[in-house]
Amino acid sequence: MYHDFESHTITRRSFLKGAGAVGAAGLLAACGGSSSSTAASASSASSGAAASGKGLSELFTYETSGREIESWNMLYSQQAIDFNVTTNIIDGLISFDNYGKPVPALAKSWEHNEDSTVWTFHLRDDVDWVDMNGEVQDHLTSKDFLVGFEWVLNAKKNQAANTSMPSTTVVGAADYYDKTYGMDDAAGEALTYEDMLAAGVGIDAPDDYTIVYTCINPCPYFDTVASYVCCYPAPPALVEKLGVEGFRGVDYTQQWCCGPYLIEEFVADNSKRFIPNPHYYAADECNRFERVSLSMITDLTVGYQLYQNRELDELELSESTLTTITSDTSNAYNDQLCEKRPTKYAYDFHFNFYCLNSDGTPNENWNKAVANRAFRRCFQEGLNLIPYYARFNKINPLKCENNYYTMKGVCYNSKGTDYVDLVAKELGIDGEKYDGETMVHLRKSTADSIAALKKQAMDELTAIGVTFPVKAPFFFVAGDTVAQDNATVLKQCFTDSFGDDFIQLELGTYVSSLAKEVRIPKLHGFVINGWGADFGDPVNFVGQEILHDSNAYYAVNYSNIQLVAEDPADYQKELVDEFEQFTDLVNAANAIVDDTDARYEAFAKAEAYMINNSLAVPCYYDVRWCLTHVNEYTKINAMFGPCNFKYVNWETSEDAYTTAQYEEFAKAFDAAKS
């Protein structure tokens, strides 16, 4: 059910009237952390300009249609649309500050041995599980982490979700998963954490407030693994109460919480309301809102109306709204336009190599075309996406250009070199810099070279019966005018780059769930999807595209290359061979465990191979302009983990921030970061 936003019968102030208030605590840099160094970091991000007016006690924010939460189980979900909600009700061992540095959460401290093979986490002793009514249900101890870890590794309970990280890092984890995978459902579901320990999995709880993980090999980045949901706790009593199917599909009314907020109200596809957890362990160590009200909106145009009525406190701007504001010098919002930081996600074209028609028959024309390397290289070498980038950042569109599969800032070698700079060197673009005018991958392309590549693809494909133009099924959520306009502009980019005789986007819509309505039925020709790191190592990105791994998220769920590899047609054998070579390169890089620099160099070669063969094609970074009463530079900003949408320690202002203030915020943030 959608709220009729046009009527505005429920105003911001009338909604607030009579609402219960829960006092907010003092400001520190990160909930759960109280060190003076992190507190200083938090304040430094905003010291460049004073906030105008007092801060907000209640926050009104939004999510767009088609991005409704699908799972309330953090151990089971692998989607940002879920974590953006559940991170506010359940905490993990580690959180992050506004610079992306690890800070304490459920673990008050941690350390590792000399070679980083044994990691010990010391838990707080003041954490309780509460239900959605705020009533204490149980006390959190190390046993909860044993139960949670067994759940993740048990194929009959968690169905392979989130197993790739522990399986490749923790002793015995992969073997335990394989053991449970081979069992019948009843036998697997009956196993407990004690069976996991008996099987030799490298996790131990020497006392009620200590958890120890033993790694297969030296793992200097394991703290970033431990920050992810694969290492989150599960309350034993709740798991026992709900049973396996019940806990896997737990809803918000059943869930127990140990995070900063509770869900006061949830109306699917309409709204959510968060209120402070009255028993939150870090209540005196961070600041929270008295209430967070999140509305599902059909598109950003509706969001702009809500922002103008002060029914939203922050809003990313669509291209059309940004144009409306900037084209009118008298517009009141002209001096309030704020450019945001890039999100943690690197967006890519993810091809579907096993596309089906709506009747379940193979889409042979697309499948043949996309298996052809020259066809895919046209996406890489000939597609001018600047008009598409302008849909996200009209003022500085090329700030959105992405040339890598892995997100910037995920990891650095011993010399402080960003991993993606190593990839750039392998690709031969390390000398290319942002110029605000030309896409990097088009600088070496000419009209003749693009035409030659197009001709090569058409000749090779015509020879195996492909008809032109090739129709590429591409879907967006119905009713979202911004998404529709984005898709329309993307379609025009293909026309402008290649003409209409080669590739044409065949636009389609889904009602509410891309997964259920498009991805699972395999209807997409390609999707543009973003991946954010779960932990700080390149394998977490490129490992999602490999063969022979049931945990490779994109290979299993989007490209369907693993299905193709089982019985490839003649026209798919070269494609499968390319994926096999890529998989070998990734596995070889992942086997280097005693030399981080060599490991990253090997991964860079693997990633460059993937990009050069266009097995997936880098597309964009999300760099938006916004109107806001929230200082983005005080939000959690980690390149990995699920914590970035946690509503804690946000600096806000009753008056909207200005462009000048945000420029000062950025300068202060960068100065403090360096």
Where are these regions (language model features)?
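Detector for C-terminal structural segments
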Residues: 21, 28, 378-424, 478, ...
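Alpha-helical secondary-structure segments
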Residues: 141-147, 208-214, 260, 289-291, ...
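Aromatic- and charge-enriched surface segment that lines or borders ligand/interaction sites
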Residues: 108-172, 212, 303-306, 365-371, ...
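N-terminal secretory signal peptides
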Residues: 1-10, 18-30
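Gly/Pro-rich hinge or "lid" segments in bacterial periplasmic/extracellular proteins
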Residues: 185-190, 197-200, 206-209, 214-293, ...
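Ligand/substrate-recognition segments at binding pockets and active sites
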Residues: 268, 396-397, 433-533, 578, ...
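Ligand-site clamp/hinge motif
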Residues: 244-252, 279-328
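N-terminal lobe/hinge region of extracytoplasmic solute-binding protein
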Residues: 61-114, 256-257
